[in-house]
Amino acid sequence: MANLDVSQNTSDIHFSVSAADKVAELIKEEDNSNLNLRVSITGGGCSGFQYGFSFDEQINDDDTIVIQQCSDGKSSVKLLVDSMSYQYLHDAEIDYIKGIQGEQFVIRNPNAKTTCGCGSSFSIGDEDDL
């Protein structure tokens, strides 16, 4: 299991306070403080790759851990990204927004060359672009 030292928060993946607040709310609803938000990339979707969100108690040795303090200033949550997904998510921002279309997690990913209208699928350019 990975070391949970806060100094690991040197990732270039950005995890917004609003996303952290929503994750903390969902974890509280699940009544399991050991849960972390895992963001992953898998093949599929209409553009070639798709984002996945899940809760995970397990922190793997190759996970990048992003720790974000919640707006209450007291609690924090962990975002986990496996090493394969990390290459597609570097410099990305994971946010939680409320708008006309409802509430949702969104990923603003500068590595995506095209995105699907639904926002959950994307494609990249050449592998050299990563």
Swiss-Prot record:
Names of the cofactor(s): iron-sulfur cluster
Protein name, as recorded: Iron-sulfur cluster insertion protein ErpA
Gene: erpA
Keyword Transport applies: no
Protein origin, superkingdom: Bacteria
SUPFAM superfamilies linked to this entry: HesB-like domain
PANTHER family found in the cross-reference section: IRON-SULFUR CLUSTER ASSEMBLY 2 HOMOLOG, MITOCHONDRIAL
Pfam families: Fe-S_biosyn
Binding site for iron-sulfur cluster: 46, 116, 118
Transmembrane segments: none
Similarity comment: family membership: Belongs to the HesB/IscA family.
Protein purpose: Required for insertion of 4Fe-4S clusters for at least IspG.
Cofactor note as given: Binds 1 iron-sulfur cluster per subunit.
Quaternary context: Homodimer.
GO MF term (any one): 2 iron, 2 sulfur cluster binding
Gene3D superfamilies noted in UniProt: HesB-like domain (2.60.300.12)
GO biological process entries: iron-sulfur cluster assembly
The entry's keywords: Iron, Iron-sulfur, Metal-binding
